[in-house]
């Protein structure tokens, strides 16, 4: 849940309901971004489309507002005291259903400040390394573990590193599988958001001059692209260097079958097998 788009009370009630319906199967991931690609969409997500976009606030203001909302969400979930500045009487609000707790809460981030927030609140932390140097993920998770403060007895650091990965029969095949997503990234950053296209169209696409400039600036060092053994080795090395407890992969493809096949190739390379059907 991108918390700036929702009220903490709304999120608390939604996820308590989900936790009631599917006990043990729900996690609540919380992020600071709105997910919007432009100011007008961002305003529509938060204040409604009838309002002009609010003037951009500084990063510290955004961070402080998010931290307050996150603390309020945890308080509505019965996990914390309400933060200073919360509405009078907030602690008396009856959050429904009131006989089930919030599911486990994870903070998603990509910066040192997010790592510090997760550590200060004693939350599990999922750090995305998208479009970034993998060394930043290693440093971010080191900072998280170093600063971790348990909120309750038994709490301990739990770190996830989030990566983009495309696994083909070989590197050339993997690069082709990644081409629709990378094209969409370039077009979005150039101001022309577009859906994923089939591989053959992505490979044949001719970039405009502005798009070429954007593509040249993209830092794709954190992407895992290659054959099964190559990606398995890269993934294992990063997991060991970062000390991650879990790895989460994002594999956006035009064809769903390509995504499934990519996961299957990597699973076989690292020795994972599908669980037996119930």
What would you call each of these model-derived segments?
Residues 113-134:
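A conserved active-site cap/scaffold subdomain adjacent to cofactor or substrate pockets
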Residues 1-3, 31-35, 110, 130-132, ...:
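Active-site beta-loop-alpha junctions enriched in small/polar residues
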Residues 18, 118, 174, 238, ...:
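Conserved, mostly hydrophobic/aromatic
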Residues 1-9, 99-109, 219-228:
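Active-site mouth loops of central-metabolism enzymes
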Residues 233, 239-278:
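Generic C-terminus detector
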Residues 49-53, 59-94, 135-242, 274-276:
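An alpha-helical appendage that flanks or caps ligand/catalytic pockets
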Residues 25-29, 104-106, 124-126, 158-162, ...:
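Structural preference for beta-strand elements that scaffold enzyme active sites
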Residues 3-81, 133:
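Flexible, glycine-rich active-site loops centered on histidine and acidic residues
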């Amino acid at each position: 849940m991108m918390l700036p788009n929702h009220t903490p009370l709304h999120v608390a009630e939604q996820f308590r309901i989900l936790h009631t319906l599917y006990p043990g199967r729900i996690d609540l991931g919380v992020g600071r971004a709105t997910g919007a690609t432009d100011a007008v969409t961002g305003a529509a997500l938060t204040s409604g489309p009838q309002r002009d976009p609010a003037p951009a606030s500084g990063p510290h203001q955004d961070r402080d507002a998010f931290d307050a909302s996150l603390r309020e969400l945890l308080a509505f979930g019965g996990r914390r005291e309400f933060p200073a500045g919360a509405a009078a009487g907030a602690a008396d609000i009856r959050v429904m259903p009131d006989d089930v707790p919030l599911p486990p809460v994870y903070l998603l981030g990509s910066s040192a400040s997010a790592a510090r927030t997760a550590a200060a609140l004693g939350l599990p932390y999922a750090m995305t390394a998208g479009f970034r140097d993998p060394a930043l993920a290693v440093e971010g998770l080191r900072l998280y573990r170093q600063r971790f403060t348990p909120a309750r007895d038994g709490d301990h650091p739990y770190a996830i590193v989030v990566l983009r990965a495309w696994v083909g029969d070989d590197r050339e095949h993997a690069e082709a599988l990644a081409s629709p997503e990378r094209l969409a990234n370039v077009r979005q950053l150039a101001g022309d958001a577009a859906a994923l296209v089939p591989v053959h169209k992505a490979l044949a696409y001719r970039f405009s001059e502005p798009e070429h400039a954007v593509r040249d600036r993209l830092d794709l060092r954190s992407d895992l692209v290659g054959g099964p053994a190559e990606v398995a080795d890269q993934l294992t090395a990063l997991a060991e260097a970062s000390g991650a407890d879990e790895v989460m992969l994002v594999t956006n493809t035009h064809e769903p079958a390509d995504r499934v096949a990519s996961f299957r190739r990597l699973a076989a390379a690292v020795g994972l097998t599908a669980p037996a059907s119930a």
